């Protein structure tokens, strides 16, 4: 049996995770691999596509549980997953698919706006052949930013949004009001 692998791309908001996911998927497409991308169903900002903040995009399959779309993706070699932190079954799905020979590329936030682990996404680190941690630019002081800071009053963990709700910040600016 051929084994696949897991590539986990993590970082804060605006660090280029989706851009990197799309770049890798498009590279595999050029190499004649059959590729698909899965996105989180509740992220309705861009319809049935994954968009980057600079308007690059690919079409995607939308779902809230990855196992719900297994039948749609089994014929693909490469499975890209955007916003991986939102999928409750991300760990078992990724491990099972990689063990079946699929290449799984996941873009995900590594922490919440409270700097706590985001659901089970960090459990993929010991299961991944490759982990890429990206930084953004601090939207306050322009240094490297490793954190996402919510700029609205909502308290729930799952709050989908962009610059209207979040900014990327460095350690120092995270604690500034």
UniProtKB/Swiss-Prot annotation:
Species this chain originates from: Sheeppox virus (strain KS-1) (SPPV)
SUPFAM superfamilies the UniProt entry points to: Glucocorticoid receptor-like (DNA-binding domain), P-loop containing nucleoside triphosphate hydrolases
Stored InterPro entries: P-loop_NTPase, Thymidine_kinase, Thymidine_kinase_CS
EC number: 2.7.1.21
Active site: 83 (proton acceptor)
Similarity comment: family membership: Belongs to the thymidine kinase family.
Binding site for Zn(2+): 138, 141, 170, 173
One function term, GO molecular function aspect: thymidine kinase activity
Pfam families: TK
Record flagged with keyword Ligase: no
Residues involved in substrate binding: 113, 157-161
Catalytic activity, as annotated: thymidine + ATP = dTMP + ADP + H(+)
Name listed for the protein in its UniProt record: Thymidine kinase
Binding site for ATP: 11-18
Coiled-coil stretches noted in the UniProt entry, renumbered to this chain: none
Keywords assigned by UniProt, alphabetized: ATP-binding, DNA synthesis, Kinase, Metal-binding, Nucleotide-binding, Transferase, Zinc
Example GO BP: thymidine metabolic process
